[in-house]
Amino acid sequence: MFRFIIIAMLLILYLILMIPVMLILLLISRYNNKLSSTIGQAMVRFIFKIILFIAGTKVEIKGLENIPKDGGVLFVSNHRSYFDILIAYAYTPKELGFISKSEMSKYILLKQWMYIVNCLFLDRKDIKKGMKTIMEAIEKVKSGTSIWICPEGTRLKGDNQKELLEFKEGSFKIAEKAKAPIVPVILNNTGDIFERQFPKIKAVKVGIEYLTPIYMEELPKETVKKIGEYTRELIKDKLV
């Protein structure tokens, strides 16, 4: 419980004290979005690493060599914890943005920081708005920003670490239309940090592993039609 209180206080202080910086970055983004997001992501990466340290989270990283150095990438992972996002930003060596549920856009200050670090808000109830978000993500990937999706659509709860919900196929259009590689990512044991003993935060060892990139143009057409299912099986086979 002590860790939870310290982390909550740190986040609140950060959001309040960094308001002037946030406003400057939002202003910069009107003229140079890349500069704004680069500075913003460096700040977010730093604060997320501090939070993970306070949480006692030890992160084992594998497969960094599988991340293409040039161009935008579509990262696809399982989703067990709020801490998944912290780990992704802290340790992924790419300019990165997440596709988040639209409900997150209701939180003032958090919403602005998410905008700065290239996050997009997906309204799953409105097809037209959802397609607009996917198109924005495609343009970001084409411009060199990588996008991270959790195609289960929600955090999966339960004790079976190898269990996965169905992967929704729609978001995979980002890679297809942007002609970008898909990098499957495995997040192991992240649910043990917080969700299993809410509101306590437990010091645990977790893993993040980047798998071999998938190039859709190299796959059979039938596999491309079910690319979500194909990617899901690759991740499921490696979950521990």
Predicted ranges, named:
Residues I50-G72:
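A short, well-structured juxtamembrane/interface segment
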Residues I61, F75, F98, I149, ...:
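Generic preference for hydrophobic
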Residues M131-V240:
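Non-catalytic C-terminal accessory region of glycerolipid acyltransferases
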Residues F4, F46, F83, K129-T133, ...:
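Short, conserved clusters of charged catalytic residues that mark active-site
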Residues M22, L26-A42, I54, K69-I127:
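Catalytic core of membrane glycerolipid acyltransferases/transacylases, capturing the structured
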Residues M1-K58:
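N-terminal membrane-anchoring alpha-helices
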